[in-house]
């Protein structure tokens, strides 16, 4: 299975919607796409919608953590939303929810960032 990446810019927020599998085969493509979008659009915040993400491994966690650090340097925030139970468990085990906020829906996350 592959990874479909949908990126949408809303003011200074980049919405990232992932569908499929985020693993060592697809992580570099996501990293490059998101980094380019952040740099080209003056992005300060990320909303990561994982509702359609069926699988993620440590490579995926690494990409997400790297983008979190990139956004933090801009005094921004990353919000994960609409996460599947299996991927949520991986986030919990890795401790990422200690630094990255989880919201129920993309709409709610955008509202909290003032762009909905």
Swiss-Prot record:
One of its GO terms (biological process) is sporulation resulting in formation of a cellular spore. GO terms for molecular function: anti-sigma factor antagonist activity; antisigma factor binding. It comes from the Bacteria. The lineage of its organism: Bacteria, Bacillati, Bacillota, Bacilli, Bacillales. This is Anti-sigma F factor antagonist. Phosphorylated by SpoIIAB on a serine residue. It comes from Heyndrickxia coagulans (Weizmannia coagulans). Belongs to the anti-sigma-factor antagonist family. The modification Phosphoserine is found at residue 58. The keyword Cell inner membrane does not apply. Pfam families: STAS. InterPro entries: Anti-sigma_ant, Anti-sigma_F_ant, STAS_dom, STAS_dom_sf. Residues 3-113 form the STAS domain. Keywords: Phosphoprotein, Sporulation. In the phosphorylated form it could act as an anti-anti-sigma factor that counteracts SpoIIAB and thus releases sigma f from inhibition.
């Amino acid at each position: 299975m592959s990874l479909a990446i949908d990126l949408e810019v809303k003011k200074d927020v980049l919405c990232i919607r992932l569908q499929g599998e985020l693993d060592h085969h697809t992580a570099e493509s996501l990293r490059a796409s998101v980094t380019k979008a952040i740099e080209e659009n003056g992005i300060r915040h990320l909303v990561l919608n994982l509702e359609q993400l069926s699988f993620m491994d440590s490579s995926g966690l690494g990409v997400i953590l790297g983008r979190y650090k990139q956004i933090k340097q801009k005094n921004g925030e990353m919000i994960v939303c609409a996460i599947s139970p299996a991927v949520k468990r991986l986030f919990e085990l890795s401790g990422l929810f200690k630094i990255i906020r989880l919201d129920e829906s993309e709409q709610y996350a955008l509202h909290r960032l003032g762009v909905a």
